[in-house]
Amino acid sequence: KKEKSSKLPSSFLYQGLSNNNIDAYMGTFGKAVGTFGSFISGSKDLIDLLVQKSKPYIYSTSIPPSIVEATRASLKIIIKNKSLNDRLAENIKFFKDTAKLYNLNINKSMMPIQTITLGSPELAMKIQKLALDKKLFVQAIRYPTVPKNKDLIRINITSKHTKKHIKELLVFL
């Protein structure tokens, strides 16, 4: 199936890749889809092999039907509303470009999850609390989740954020 948008960092077109020689697609339903679980799509032979031999698949509990339906509904919204993907890509770019103006130590990723390395667990927790007091949500990520002295804050950029929201956060930081 042809890509809907090449503006998203996760799209093959964005990364200059071709999907002609790919045996399997793997992904999760967390983050962008807003549910949980994961998927693998591939040839019938590959899927049959995984169903018979994959221990994580064999020994895990099935996803509840309500989560399956929520995932389907989310995917329909994503597919139907191409503008959401385009706006997300624009918001990520705006965040990255504007953060540079403030000399923030942001990661190189063009994905919706952005991080700013702080190097101190106390500073990460302080920023998280101060941000929450201003109704801004950032997450402190500390050791042992990250290496010592690599503590950071995590920011989730969405298609529903406005440039005003993003700038307000960056001014705060």
Predicted regions and their residues:
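Short hydrophobic/aromatic beta-strand micro-patches
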Residues: 41, 115-117, 156-158
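Conserved core segment of the aminotransferase class I/II
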Residues: 22-26, 33-85
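PLP-dependent enzyme catalytic core of the Aspartate aminotransferase-like
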Residues: 133-134, 145-173
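Conserved PLP-dependent catalytic core of the aminotransferase class-I/II
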Residues: 65, 69-137
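Cytosolic Rossmann-like ligand/nucleotide-binding regulatory domains
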Residues: 141-142
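Solvent-exposed alpha-helices and their adjacent loops that cap or buttress functional pockets
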Residues: 16-20, 30-33, 147
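Active-site pre-lysine segment of PLP-dependent enzymes
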Residues: 1-24
